Amino acid sequence: MSNQMEFIMQLYMMNLMKQQQQMQLQLPQQQQQQQLAGYTYTQNEDISSSTSVQQQQQQQQEQLQQPQPDLRKTRTHKRISSQNTNCSSSRSCSPNSNLIAFQPQQYPGATAATPSTPNSHPSNLVNQMLLQSLPPLTQLMLQQQQQQHLLTTSNLLLTPTHTPSSLGKQDPLQHPLLLGQFAGSEQMATNNFLQSSTVTSTPIEREKAATPAPSAGATAGNLSAAQVKFEQESADDDEDDDKPLSSLTSCSSSGHTNASSEKLLLSGVHPLESTTDSLDSPSMYTPVKQPADSSYGLITPVDSDLTPNTPLQPTQTISLLTPPSSEQSKSLVSLSAASGLDALLQNEEVLKNLRKVSSYLECENSLCRQENLREHFHCHEEPCQGKILSKKDDIIRHLKWHKKRKESLKLGFARFSSSDDCAPAYGEGCAYNWKQTHYHCVYEHCPKVYVSTSDVQMHANFHRKDSEIVNEGFRRFRAHETCRIEDCPFFGKKISHYHCCREGCTHTFKNKADMDKHKTYHLKDHQLKMDGFKKILKTEVCPFDACKFSTVCNHIHCVREGCDYILHSSSQMISHKRKHDRQDGEQAYQQFKIKQDVEESSLDAMPQQQQQQQQQQPTSLSQSQSSSSVCGGSNTSTPLSSLSAEHFLARKRGRPPKKIQLPADAQQSEAKRLKVEDESSNPAMLLPQSQPAAAVHPLTSGLFPGLLPAAAAPGVDPTAPNFQLTHLMALFQLQNPLFYQNLYPGMTQNSSMLGNLAALSAASAAAAAAAAANGAGVQQPKAEFSFKPEFKE
């Protein structure tokens, strides 16, 4: 038994020596960080090597003196006992129960970051090993199995802790089972950061619970939020609940990130990381209040990045992000105003009313000559009328005065400063004249004067609403205003009401909702007037004389001329309007017929006047026509309009004429001739007697007897043959064979007959022309034969 106890004590002392070496390595770094940050650890957290050894030895003696409980405990009993131990603390139920610092220790190669939860009776395993005589190897194996058993039990009770935020902080023990056996439950309750009875542990709670002092796994380049967070615990446990919400949420950030975030905060930009840091985090920095002459946002940034050993200023550790002060906002306004003045001086629209004068010698103003002004300006903008400006400050002040005056005029107010006289425009009774800046309302019948710009805005809104009401066709009178209309039912009653401003309407109402209703009534009334009707309400007196429905019921009058019809429903208007439309159409048609008859009678009188004028013409024209016909020969011709084949093609389709008689001699006028064309079918042949023939020169007709038509002499026989028409027919047959081919399908089988017919027609036309040229002395035989072509169907 003594050998077993010595073996256990040796293992325990070896672990203590390693722990003390680690603590000695970490103490200088802890002291340096505590001096830099100005914080101290509590005595509960600062565990030195000597005190820990003494406390653990006392606990070991107490465990040996305690009676032995039941050695056989199931897994469920161990879980229940561990939960009862964890929830025994009064601080485990609070939301800030994880604020007690836990001392992590280096454990190379460890895989779990959650230490094992100790049992309420850690001496059970020691007593079992002392009472039972087992070889050392068996005892060591049993010890390892129970260690694994406790680790699996704690893993079942807790959520997984391998999260990205906890990968850089591995704080298990080398032999948590041995430390749990010889360490008291109270001491482990202080060092354990999972004291809550619940089984929902989150990485954020672990980060809140851990402190940076004993952490040896953190690298020099990275500082987690838990490493830069120093908690000052008080004696009262309830003070933890009074902390703001920002202290309950923390996130990991590196030292470089903290420095960059401080730079961003100093320049007025809020990074995303600093919004979730705790109060004590160095990344949560508030800009220091600057004096009045400095501008907000122009603070010089930090020169160097923060490192884990960089001292933190008190203003950086204990400060909140606050908006700029009133003095800073004033400096902002001054800077913006300065930039605005430069833009004001560069604006040509503002400077167009300023006239620069280089010297008083060029200026016509007597005041400038009296003062011997050199370079100065004159403002000719209304209402300055040539005000003298000699200094740059005066020019800037005057331009700003004009700008403010224009802005106030947009709101309906005239601005007057303390150096302006408002008496010429608004009388002598102003109490603010020559005293302070004030605003006069420019609207008619409005004597309001204000000093505050907020009152100006409110009064401008009143006039804006009033102008909207006027645009709708109404006028509003408030309770203190008099409408000056004695017939108004609200006259002298001090009631806000409305009047309709439309012509002939005296409607009044006090509810603004009735405005749209009355406006709709006027729109409908206008439409009825366009259709020729007028609607009278029951509440109105009918303007029509002797109307029996006046003030009795709603009715509609027809306002058309000569109509006294009264309608009682809007459905009757359609039929009544159609009746008037029909009557108007009949009247318009009658007027059109009368006008048309007058025009026809005037056209009939015109031909009679033309005939009388033609009869009075001299006979010289007829003599010239007879002489030209003698020179041209005895043949007669038709006008050019008759030479076309239009009338020839206009005849009825069928078989060609059976007989085509060739033209005979001009002297044998008594010979029979086949009438090729009816005179009634050719309107061009029927020339009116009153129409004079075209005068043709006798030489022209003699040179070209066959081409130019000769005027028909009154002494020529009308039965003489027309050679030009016959020649044209033959020529058309030669030029258009397809026409006859389509007209007479049988001709395709005897195409030579068409050529013979064309040749014969051409020969006869040439013979007739030669006979006409030889004169009347040469007699030609009477060629009277018939040509009858045969067609095979």
From Swiss-Prot:
Biased composition (Acidic residues): 233-242
UniProt keyword list: Developmental protein, Differentiation, DNA-binding, Metal-binding, Neurogenesis, Nucleus, Phosphoprotein, Repeat, Repressor, Transcription, Transcription regulation, Zinc, Zinc-finger
Superkingdom of the source species: Eukaryota
Tissue: Expressed in a specific subset of neuroblasts in the ventral nerve cord and the procephalic region in the embryo. Expressed in many, if not all, late delaminating NBs, and in early NBs, but only after they have undergone several rounds of ganglion mother cell-producing divisions.
Molecular function terms from GO: DNA binding; DNA-binding transcription factor activity; DNA-binding transcription factor activity, RNA polymerase II-specific; RNA polymerase II transcription regulatory region sequence-specific DNA binding; zinc ion binding
One Gene Ontology cellular component annotation held by this UniProt entry: nucleus
Entry-linked InterPro entries: CASZ1, Znf_C2H2_type
DNA-binding region: 650-662
Phosphothreonine: residues bearing it: 211
Comp. bias (Polar residues): 44-53, 273-284, 630-644
Zinc finger (C2H2-type): 377-402, 439-463, 498-522, 556-580
GO biological process, one term: central nervous system development
Compositionally skewed regions (Low complexity) per UniProt: 54-68, 81-98, 210-221, 245-254, 608-629
Designated name of the protein: Transcription factor castor
Organism annotation: Drosophila melanogaster
GN (gene name): cas
